[in-house]
């Protein structure tokens, strides 16, 4: 049986204690230490020989160590000290960039693999949606993953579910115990597959769509009519569909259709 710490590069153990505490506090970073989980994540990415891979926040390099054997790897690490050690270990096999992924201009990529920092999972995810890539296998905090993949009618279905659905098809792959990390988080994690695709609807105005989604899910227990009135004060909603329903029951396509009708009224 493989030990969770087997394969861990001992150079990372020399990190000053204050550095580790600072990184955890600033980035919400919990390092994966289970080699079996790391291998499972990479295998599920189904990487082909000629594909270009992006890893975000490689940390101590447990995924990096496997990914460099799979294809052309670009790893982006924000933490200066970790980036230095990663470059020492992987510079001949991968391109290691010290940068904040939220500011980094992502080149053409086929596959994304990452254990994302819990505290900034959402901004990173929507940053990725601005770029072209085929698929991703990402690890999130379990609660975030549940909201990401949620379907209409479920308690976790909301703004995140609808907006992510505009860009990708999501699927839960497997749960990861909190014991697979160092430091150990308070809750479990979930690995999710994302496949890029176009939505099954056409939007007349994306900004209006964002506004509608935000409006109807901010007060999710209110009727849609009452939610929209708070943000679209000059629009009469009586002739629109779904006004007496709650947002949690609408399909993304139905929300898009509602958004298009509101945009048409605004444009008159």
Positions of PLM-derived features:
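Catalytic cores of RNA-modifying enzymes
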Residues: 21-215, 253-264
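C-terminal lobe and adjacent flexible extensions of AdoMet/dcAdoMet transferase-like proteins
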Residues: 215-268
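Low-complexity, intrinsically disordered or signal/transmembrane-proximal segments
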Residues: 6, 18-19
């Amino acid at each position: 049986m493989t030990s969770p710490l087997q394969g861990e590069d001992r150079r990372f153990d020399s990190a000053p204690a204050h550095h580790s505490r600072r990184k955890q506090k600033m980035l919400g970073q919990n390092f994966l230490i289970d080699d079996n989980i790391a291998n499972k994540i990479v295998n599920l990415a189904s990487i082909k020989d000629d594909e270009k891979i992006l890893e975000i926040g490689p940390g101590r390099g447990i995924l990096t160590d496997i990914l460099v054997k799979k294809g052309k790897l670009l790893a982006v690490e924000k933490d200066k000290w970790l980036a230095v050690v990663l470059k020492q270990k992987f510079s001949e096999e991968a391109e290691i960039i010290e940068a904040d992924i939220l500011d980094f201009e992502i080149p053409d990529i086929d596959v994304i693999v990452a254990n994302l920092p819990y505290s900034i999972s959402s901004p990173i995810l929507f940053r990725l949606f601005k770029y072209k890539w085929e698929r991703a296998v990402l690890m999130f905090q379990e609660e975030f993953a549940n909201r990401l993949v949620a379907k209409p009618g479920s308690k976790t279905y909301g703004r995140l579910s609808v907006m992510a659905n505009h860009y990708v098809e999501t699927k839960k792959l497997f749960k990861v115990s909190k014991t697979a990390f160092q430091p150990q988080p308070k809750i479990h994690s979930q690995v999710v597959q994302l496949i890029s695709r176009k939505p099954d609807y056409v939007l007349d105005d994306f900004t209006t769509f964002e506004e509608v989604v935000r409006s109807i899910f901010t007060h999710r227990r209110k009727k849609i009519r009452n939610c929209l009135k708070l943000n679209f004060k000059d629009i009469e909603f009586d002739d629109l569909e779904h006004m007496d329903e709650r947002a949690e029951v609408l399909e993304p396509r139905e929300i898009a259709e509602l958004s298009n009708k509101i945009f048409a009224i605004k444009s008159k």
